[in-house]
Amino acid sequence: MRHLIVLPLVLLTSSYKLFAQSFTFADTANFWLNELKAATKANQSLWNKDLYSPILLVNPVDRKVYANEPDSAGILKKQGPIFYGSLPTSVNISNTALEWSGKRWAMVMLPMPEEKANRLNLLTHELFHRAQPELGFVAYNPNNPHLDTRDGRIYLRMELEALKNAIAATDMKRRLQHVRHALIYRLERFQKFPGSDTTENQLELNEGICEFNGLLMSGRSDAEIREHLTARIDQFALSPSFVRSFAYETTPVYGWLLSSIDRGWNQRINASTDLTQFFIKAFGLQIDRPTIDQEAWQATPLYNGEEISRQETERETARQLLLNQYKKQFVESVHLQLPLINMNMSFDYTKMVVLEPYGTVYPVIRITDKWGTLEASKGVLISNKWDSATVSLPLQTAGNKISGDGWTLELNPGYTIEKDDVSNKFTVKPFLHP
């Protein structure tokens, strides 16, 4: 079974010196876990369930792990109030939910955010990932390549600008007008990119609802939530890729705004809910599809549409140059192709680049599979069918370790690299004894 693990990579700082003494950090971790336990208990009415459950706090530098429960295999040993051990190298480290050592866990990378609200937001986001199957949700992970195009990004940014105005509005009539405009820009996007309504909805039902849960369990006041969401939208506009990251921004805003007039709305949704239509109905809006083009155009000056269009046109020029570079690197030049069989991967979801019709380039990624472990910092092309990973030409080989420009591969026993002179590429294959 293939497992997709997504994460924004965390910049590790000298703060890890604080964690040098494991006993001291065990007390710190226990403090965070007690904070978390109190927050989930106080908010159990959100889903009629206390989400506190097995969780791993992992140091990606040395793979040390701190947990609130023992694992079934006895890898984690009790150390004061918590459990402590080392995570095997076969397990990719990220913010996610996973099955490991006999249990289903939430996993969160260290270091923790310094502010309590941000810390609880992150931890409860991942606890919701762990609880998704129990709550009737599915961890959909579709890409949304249209959100890497000029028009797709413009419509999404216009939607978010309208939502930002809705956050700031104190008058309910004005707030609903901005929400209406946001949903109109969304419907315009769906109309321009057929099928995007399905793929966007799937990611919002996964990451979007997780982030909504984190927001409401963060302990922020309404004023702090307004400030937090507004800052997030402004920061998101600078993100290099919207393909997988948009749902972290859209769904929490709609969800928080709706909670002010319909608390408990989230208990009426499931894995098959069309969130766009749900929001239109829940907000009491009437949107006439034949007139949305005109309404979207008329509302554009309210949301800085001209400047957004200018910025995205400029970005598109730079994107085309990057796509040409990636096409030469991964398609036209000699390269190494690895089959994806039973893959686990961790990557930075804010930097993905869609390279149609070949797949998606992940600039920073770690992949484990039957053949071994691949780590790359200058890009890996994952095919659209999720059946292969491509890196640039192999340059050095030392035993089972192979490397190229910006990547290293450690092969497991029984696998080797062969060159195919016909297709002008190298491939990883099982080693066949004569």
Predicted regions and their residues:
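N-terminal mature-domain "stem" immediately C-terminal to a signal peptide or N-terminal signal-anchor/transmembrane
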Residues: 21-79, 210
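Active-site-proximal alpha-helical
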Residues: 194-224, 233-290
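Active-site recognition of the HExxH zinc-binding catalytic motif
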Residues: 121-134
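Bacterial Sec-dependent N-terminal signal peptides
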Residues: 1-24
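Short pre-active-site segment immediately N-terminal to the catalytic Zn-binding motif
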Residues: 108-123
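Catalytic zinc-binding patch centered on the HExxH motif and its immediate surroundings
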Residues: 83-102
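Non-catalytic terminal regions of proteins
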Residues: 270-434
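Post-HExxH zinc-binding segment in Zn-dependent metallohydrolases
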Residues: 134-190, 196, 200-226
